[in-house]
Amino acid sequence: MDLPGPIHDFLLVFLGSGLILGGLGVVLRINPIYSAFSLGLVLVCISLFYILTNYHFVATAKLLIYVGAINVLILFVVMFMNSSEYYKDFNPWTIGNGLTSLVCTSILVSLISTILDTSWYGIIWTTRSNQIIEQDLIGNSQQIGIHLATDFFLPFEFISIILLVALIGAIDVTLQ
C-alpha cells in the first residue's frame, strides 16, 4: 500500500502494538474463549501487515484460512468442552512456568540483539518472478505457483510450520 510516511509509520506502530497485546492475551488469558479471540486479533494484525507490504494474496489467504477456519474451529472446540473445570483450580505461577518464562525471555533478548546487530540493507530476500519467466506466457494458476515459490516463499513456509504446530496441538489435546 502506497501511503505517506507518517501514516505508514503510525499504522505499523498501531498494528505492532495490537499484535503484542493480542499475543499477550493469547498467553495470559485463563479463559480459553478469550484466548481464542486474542488469537483472532493476532491473525488479523498479521494479515494487515501483509496488506501494508503489498502482499494482498498472502493477506487474503491468511484471513480466510486462519481467522475464517482455524480460529473458528478452535472456538467451536473450546465451547463444546466443559472449560470451567479446567481453569477453576488454576495456579498460573509454578516452577515450570517460571522456567519457561526465563527461557522465552532469554530467546527474545537474543533475537532482539541479533536483529539490532544485523545490517539489513545488503540482504536480498528473493528474486522477482518476472525476471524468471515472462508473465504473458503463463496462466493465472501458474503465476500464483511462481509467486508462492519465489516472492512468498518465507511466508508460505511459516504458514506450513504453524499448521504443523496446530496439528500437533490438536493431537495432544485429543490424547489427553
From Swiss-Prot:
Keywords: Chloroplast, Membrane, NAD, NADP, Plastid, Plastoquinone, Quinone, Thylakoid, Translocase, Transmembrane, Transmembrane helix, Transport. GO terms for cellular component: chloroplast thylakoid membrane. It is a multi-pass membrane protein. InterPro entries: NAD(P)H-Q_Oxidoreduct_6 (IPR050290), NADH_UbQ/plastoQ_OxRdtase_su6 (IPR001457), Nuo/plastoQ_OxRdtase_6_NuoJ (IPR042106). Its EC number is 7.1.1.-. NDH is composed of at least 16 different subunits, 5 of which are encoded in the nucleus. NDH shuttles electrons from NAD(P)H:plastoquinone, via FMN and iron-sulfur (Fe-S) centers, to quinones in the photosynthetic chain and possibly in a chloroplast respiratory chain. The immediate electron acceptor for the enzyme in this species is believed to be plastoquinone. Couples the redox reaction to proton translocation, and thus conserves the redox energy in a proton gradient. PANTHER family: NAD(P)H-QUINONE OXIDOREDUCTASE SUBUNIT 6, CHLOROPLASTIC (PTHR48479:SF1). Belongs to the complex I subunit 6 family. This is NAD(P)H-quinone oxidoreductase subunit 6, chloroplastic.
